[in-house]
From Swiss-Prot:
Keyword Disulfide bond: yes
Range of residues in the leader sequence: 1-20
Organism: Emericella nidulans (strain FGSC A4 / ATCC 38163 / CBS 112.46 / NRRL 194 / M139)
Pfam family, any one: Hydrophobin
Subunit: Self-assembles to form functional amyloid fibrils called rodlets. Self-assembly into fibrillar rodlets occurs spontaneously at hydrophobic:hydrophilic interfaces and the rodlets further associate laterally to form amphipathic monolayers.
Protein name: Class I hydrophobin dewE
Keyword Signal in record: yes
Top-rank taxon, per record: Eukaryota
Source taxonomy: Eukaryota, Fungi, Dikarya, Ascomycota, Pezizomycotina
One of the record's GO cellular component terms: fungal-type cell wall
Length: 109
């Protein structure tokens, strides 16, 4: 019984990871979809990253429900940013320090 439960949990986690990882086809966002300003993020990771998942859990967020990347150490996008601007569509927490559902803007917008 425990093996079946463990396999079920792994199957659900695997499918959640696959759906949480952005694909090239749907990771681009329109600026009108963004919550808050465009962000310059220190790094982007999957919501199920072993370092990020416990943090999300502490603030009551189900990592498996996030569509897109998690932006870490973000701030409002400006001329000093060396990466492309990120549009976060699910949450912009702590002044952008943690952005949920992040991805690049559609080209041409």
């Amino acid at each position: 019984m425990k093996v079946a439960t463990a396999l079920s949990v792994l199957a659900v986690a695997g499918s959640a990871l696959a759906s949480a990882l952005p694909s090239a086809a749907n990771s681009e966002k329109r600026q009108s979809d963004c919550i808050g300003p465009l962000l310059c993020c220190g790094s982007l990771t999957t919501p199920l990253d072993p370092l990020v998942d416990p943090i999300l859990e502490l603030v009551g967020i189900d990592a498996a429900a996030i569509v897109g990347s998690v932006g870490l150490l973000c701030h409002a996008y400006d001329d000093t940013c060396t990466s492309e601007p990120q549009c976060c569509t699910e949450a912009n927490l702590l002044g952008g320090t943690l952005g949920l559902g992040c991805g690049p803007l559609e080209h041409g917008h």
